[in-house]
Amino acid sequence: MSKTYIPEGEKAPESQIGATLDALYATIEQRRNAGDESYTHRLLTGKLDDPLKKVMEEAGEVALAAKDGEPDHLRYEAADVVYHLMVVLARFGIGIDEFAAELNNRMRDDERPEGAVRLYETYVNRGK
C-alpha cells in the first residue's frame, strides 16, 4: 500500500520532489524577513554555527533511524536534514536551481534528465 496521495481535484506536478523543494526553498526565503519569532529567520540571520549544528544533529538522527530499521522515523529525520540543508544553502545564496545543477553535473550524460540545468565548468569545484 502506498503511503502517499494527491488530494482529490488536484493535479500532480510532473515531479513531486522538484515542486516540493521549490516550494520549501521559497518559504525559507520568505521567512528571511519574518522576524525573530520565526525559527527559519533565526537560522538564516543568527550565528552560522546554529544551522550547521542542526544539519549535523539531524544527519546523526537519520543514521540512527536507518540503523534501527524504522522507515517512518527515517523519512521524518531525512526531511529534517533536507530542510536544514536548504536553510544553509539559502544562507549562502545558493539557489535550488544551482544546487540541482551541482547534482546534474555529477551524473553522466546518459543519466541526466533531458534539459537538466548544469553548472558552467568554471563553477565546478570538486572538493578542492
Where are these regions (language model features)?
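Flexible "arm" and connector segments at domain edges
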Residues: 1-78, 82-128
